[in-house]
């Protein structure tokens, strides 16, 4: 991860890309089809926390489109001229650590994600689901239910909501 991020930062410096440039591009992106409706519906029964391996500074344009659920992620180090100089990772397994912390203070967690780095939180969540995960990933974890649309994911959340203690 460090090598990849160092390479990306080097490319951004070489191409004189600033944080504003990147945020502008991200701001032009739309949420995935069904995501906004999913969030509106899920909030009727659940508190929503986004656990992400992104950075706050990159996520803010999309967070506004989601009505700002709680976001726990990493932080960029940005210089005076908005050049990205580095980053601070909260923890190498931040998603898993966050779920464990919520569990320790009495919360029961239901998690959804789309990649390998989400499987660590599925291990400690009460329930875990893949959403839009590539089959190359979901097929390696056949015990984790996998969904390709937000309506089915919403039904899965509703089906286990009474399991929470």
Predicted feature residues:
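Alpha-helical substrate-recognition element adjacent to the catalytic core
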Residues: 1-75
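Alpha-helical segments flanking ligand/cofactor-binding loops in enzyme cores
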Residues: 36, 40, 100, 119-120
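Acidic, Mg2+-coordinating phosphoryl-transfer loop and its flanking beta/alpha structural elements
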Residues: 48, 52-53, 107-148
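Short, well-ordered alpha-helical microsegments
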Residues: 56-60, 118-119, 154
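Substrate-recognition "cap/lid" segment bordering the active-site pocket of phosphatases
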Residues: 57-109, 140
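Short, acidic/turn-prone active-site loops that include or flank metal/cofactor-
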Residues: 71-79, 133-137, 149-153
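Short amphipathic alpha-helix with an adjacent loop that forms part of the alpha/beta core around
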Residues: 154-164
């Amino acid at each position: 991860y460090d090598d990849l991020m160092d390479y990306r930062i080097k490319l951004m410096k070489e191409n004189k890309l600033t944080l504003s440039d990147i945020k502008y591009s991200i701001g032009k992106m739309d949420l995935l089809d069904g995501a906004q409706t999913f969030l509106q519906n899920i909030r009727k029964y659940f508190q929503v926390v986004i656990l992400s391996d992104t950075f706050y500074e990159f996520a803010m344009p999309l967070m506004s489109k989601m009505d700002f659920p709680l976001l726990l992620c990493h932080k960029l180090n940005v210089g005076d001229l908005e050049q990205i100089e580095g980053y601070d990772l909260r923890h190498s397994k931040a998603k898993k650590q966050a779920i464990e912390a919520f569990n320790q203070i009495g919360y029961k967690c239901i998690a959804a994600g789309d990649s390998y780095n989400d499987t660590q939180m599925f291990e400690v969540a009460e329930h875990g689901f893949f959403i839009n995960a590539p089959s190359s990933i979901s097929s390696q974890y056949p015990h984790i239910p996998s969904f390709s649309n937000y309506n089915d994911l919403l039904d899965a959340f509703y089906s286990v909501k009474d399991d929470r203690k």
